[in-house]
């Protein structure tokens, strides 16, 4: 019976993603352990350390489908050990006593850590794929609206005109940096570890480094220079990349949320058939998807707090902190996977960009949004600081008197002869003061597109749990 929100049928899978849930499922985790054991045995056989028939037999039976996961869980509670039940089951499946060669010369954390890196690699490709999809949708939006004027807001207040396309291009540029980080970090993160009980490779003997190198190479991983049982920076880096990307997408969602506020109403989520905003207010159209994305972003970040605690390992290995990873890391990836899927789905369905409302909002302050432009036009006559003082004074008077900025400027005796009415009308045209916004959209669009390593997601196991989830939130208020 599901009790965690990532498995909840009531929430319609809103907090999870089938692909990421499959990667971090019990079945896939155990299969990764078996894959590592199989690769180790194959290498040891090639090097003459164990019989070839033992390696072949281990490979023949190393399938999670042959194991009873519930039984493994019960035995894990009895033994107090997470891997021993799997090792015993694998040994029992091997014929002719060849199971004696299972797990030869390594320790539990070798198998679990290397298996975890294999899971992270599977997820890595999906993350990059989703980010690229999101980037593509946003870039299309940025180019479409690179000349669409709107209010730029600083400290929550109207500041200057900008364009909606430029706002979106800033998001694209940020996502590109995340993709670059994923590319740069790939080689550092995709490193296994088969260094034995205390990291010295004593159990693998004089050929230990070669056994480790060959085994990890067969799994598509690099070998470490030293044990990382207690050095969790690779796990932290993988998690932190997701936290950063999730923070960006959470910020994008939060921006859409506020732009959809009734008083602003410049951007709306696409409306879906059957969507209900409120159980008691029939008119409501709540931003339910960006609601969820924003919440997921915070949940991803919350798991990072636990993972940093897991980095405080004592001595050569420490279960008191290592166990934190077992809970926090899968949740972080699953929440992030849900967030990425929801954002891509939102953009694929299309945002409603309300250009007329953007234009009318530019006029809400009666021209005051162009105060900088007026000040800079005055500066050659009287100096920038004096111009700032004059325009600031006139702007405050206009707001207090409730008159438009144009009339206040024309009526101020200090500015007599400075501007004709036509010149002032031109200066106060918000569509003509968006700076180089459109050009910068083109710069973002034409720069070299990041190529992130691991962008081809490896095949994941058949989706488990609720596979009928929507890409959108299903909850109203």
Question: What function would you assign to each model-found segment?
Answer:
Residues 2-195, 200-202, 207-212, 275-277, ...:
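A helix-coil-helix interface module used to build multimeric assemblies
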Residues 210-229:
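A short, charged helix-loop
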Residues 178, 196, 228-322, 326:
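Glycine-rich anion/phosphate-binding loop at the beta-strand->alpha-helix junction
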Residues 292, 299-385:
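Long, amphipathic alpha-helical stalk/connector segments used for oligomerization, subunit docking
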Residues 166, 236-244, 373-381:
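Short, well-ordered beta-strand elements within core beta-sheets of diverse protein domains
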Residues 349-418, 434, 439-446, 450-457:
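C-terminal alpha-helical interaction appendages
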Residues 77, 121-128, 132, 139, ...:
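Short amphipathic alpha-helical segments with heptad-repeat character
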Residues 143-165, 266-277, 283-284, 315-324, ...:
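Glycine-rich cofactor-pocket loops
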């Amino acid at each position: 019976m599901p009790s965690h929100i990532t498995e909840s049928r009531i929430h319609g899978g809103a907090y999870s993603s089938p692909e990421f849930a499959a990667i971090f499922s019990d079945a896939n985790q155990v299969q990764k352990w078996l894959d590592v054991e199989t690769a180790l045995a194959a290498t040891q056989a090639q090097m003459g350390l164990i019989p070839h028939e033992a390696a072949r037999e281990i490979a023949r039976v190393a399938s999670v489908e042959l194991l009873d996961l519930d039984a493994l869980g019960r035995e894990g509670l009895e033994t107090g050990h997470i891997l021993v039940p799997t090792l015993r089951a694998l040994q029992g499946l091997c014929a002719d006593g060849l199971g004696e060669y299972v797990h030869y010369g390594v320790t539990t954390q070798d198998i679990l850590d290397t298996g975890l890196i294999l899971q992270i690699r599977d997820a890595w490709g999906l993350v990059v794929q989703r980010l690229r999809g999101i980037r593509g949708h946003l870039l299309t939006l940025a180019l479409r609206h690179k000349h669409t004027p709107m209010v730029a807001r600083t400290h929550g207040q109207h500041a200057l005109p900008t364009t909606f396309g430029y706002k979106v291009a800033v998001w694209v540029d940020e996502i590109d940096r995340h993709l670059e980080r994923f590319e740069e970090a790939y080689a550092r993160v995709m490193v296994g570890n088969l260094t034995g009980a205390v990291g010295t490779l004593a159990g693998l003997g004089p050929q230990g480094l070669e056994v480790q190198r060959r085994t990890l190479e067969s799994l598509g991983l690099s070998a470490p220079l030293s044990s990382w049982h207690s050095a969790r920076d690779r796990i932290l880096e993988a998690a932190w990349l997701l936290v950063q990307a999730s923070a960006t997408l959470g910020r994008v969602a939060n921006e859409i949320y506020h732009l959809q506020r009734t008083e602003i109403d410049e951007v709306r989520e696409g409306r879906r058939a059957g969507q209900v905003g409120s159980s008691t207010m029939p008119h409501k159209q709540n931003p339910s998807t960006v609601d969820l994305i924003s919440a997921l972003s915070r949940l991803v970040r919350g798991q990072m707090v636990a993972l940093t605690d897991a980095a405080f390992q004592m001595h050569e290995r420490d279960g008191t902190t290592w166990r934190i990873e077992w809970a926090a890391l899968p949740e972080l990836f699953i929440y992030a996977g849900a967030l990425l899927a929801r954002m891509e789905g939102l953009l694929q369905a299309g945002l409603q960009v309300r250009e007329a409302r953007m234009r009318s909002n530019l006029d809400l302050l009666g021209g005051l949004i162009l105060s900088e432009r007026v000040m800079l036009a005055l500066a050659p006559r009287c100096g920038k600081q004096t111009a700032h003082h004059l325009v600031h004074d006139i702007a405050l008077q206009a707001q207090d008197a409730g008159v438009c900025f144009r009339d206040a400027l024309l009526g101020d005796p200090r500015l007599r002869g400075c501007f004709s009415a036509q010149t002032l009308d031109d200066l106060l045209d918000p569509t003509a003061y968006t700076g180089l916004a459109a050009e910068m959209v083109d710069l973002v669009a034409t720069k070299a597109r990041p190529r992130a390593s691991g962008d081809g997601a490896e095949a994941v196991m058949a989706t488990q749990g609720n596979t009928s989830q929507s890409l959108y939130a299903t909850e109203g208020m």
